[in-house]
């Protein structure tokens, strides 16, 4: 009789869970609006190993938060988020990359998904667990990220470019490991695909584009120039010299710049910053 959202987390022996009757009953519950939290695999109470294990508490909480804790003001909005670094190979052993961990982009993807958006997370190599309630698209290089973004361009309402994409890659990739020699070594570099420039040049009026900038000086001036040059609607500016901001930390200090004004945010968690970004998108 309850009218509130209802979640079910089945936990049982693998044979019971995989029984067709159980599976039919779970489908019936979903048909009537129940959210079924997938069981995990592992050691069960009966000492068997298999599916049917109750998910960890943090996983259950994630599902509960997704169901009841946030307004679904982004429901139906198709959002693509890029996150993390790219890797540009030099040889089979080495590559050029940067210090990005992907934490900011992942936080944005999670915030948007929690508010009902249809989120695609396009990301480079990270040590982070997948973001639930999103479509996961792993890539490695700038070229792969370019292809992932452009191939989904027409099916996107909001594009949030939080990835730290390499500007240059080795002009040639050695087939074998480059051996150490006496003296210096020079590496010829070439430009990678400028994803934001392509997006700005092909941007339809309906598409909302948010970029990120990392600066060490003239934060507002340089970021505003990038906003205009790349034809973006919003840019999130980071000053890497501010304590608690930038790569590898769980906090950030950002300035959100749009054509309507500038909003400076104090030091806070990256989840908090992501919430402000989601607010800006919901209110656009």
Roles of regions detected by a PLM:
Residues 23, 27-28, 73-141:
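Glycine-rich phosphate/diphosphate-binding loop of Rossmann-like nucleotide-binding domains
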């Amino acid at each position: 009789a309850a009218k509130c959202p209802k979640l079910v987390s089945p936990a049982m022996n693998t044979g019971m869970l995989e029984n067709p009757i159980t599976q039919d009953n779970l489908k019936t519950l979903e048909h009537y609006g129940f959210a079924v939290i997938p069981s995990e695999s592992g050691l069960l109470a009966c000492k068997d190993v298999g599916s049917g294990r109750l998910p960890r508490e943090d996983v259950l909480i994630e599902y509960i938060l997704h169901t009841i804790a946030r307004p679904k003001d982004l429901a139906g909005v198709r959002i693509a988020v890029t996150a993390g670094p790219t890797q540009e190979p030099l040889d089979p052993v080495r590559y050029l990359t940067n210090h990005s961990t992907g934490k900011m982009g992942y936080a944005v993807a999670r915030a948007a998904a929690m508010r009902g958006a249809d989120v695609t997370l396009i990301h480079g190599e990270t040590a982070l667990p997948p973001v639930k309630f999103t479509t996961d698209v792993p890539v490695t290089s700038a070229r792969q990220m370019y292809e992932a973004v452009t191939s989904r361009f027409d099916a996107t309402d909001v594009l949030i470019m939080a990835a730290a994409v390499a500007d240059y890659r080795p002009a040639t990739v050695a087939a074998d490991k480059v051996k150490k020699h006496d003296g210096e070594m020079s590496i010829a570099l070439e430009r990678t695909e400028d994803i934001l420039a392509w997006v700005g040049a092909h941007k339809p009026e309906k598409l909302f584009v948010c970029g990120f900038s990392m600066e060490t000086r003239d934060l507002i001036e340089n970021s505003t120039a990038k906003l205009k040059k790349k034809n973006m609607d919003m840019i999130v500016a980071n000053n890497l010299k501010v304590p608690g901001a930038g790569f590898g930390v769980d906090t950030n200090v950002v300035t959100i710049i749009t054509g309507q004004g500038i909003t400076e945010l104090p030091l806070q968690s990256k989840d908090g910053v992501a919430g402000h970004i989601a607010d800006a998108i919901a209110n656009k």
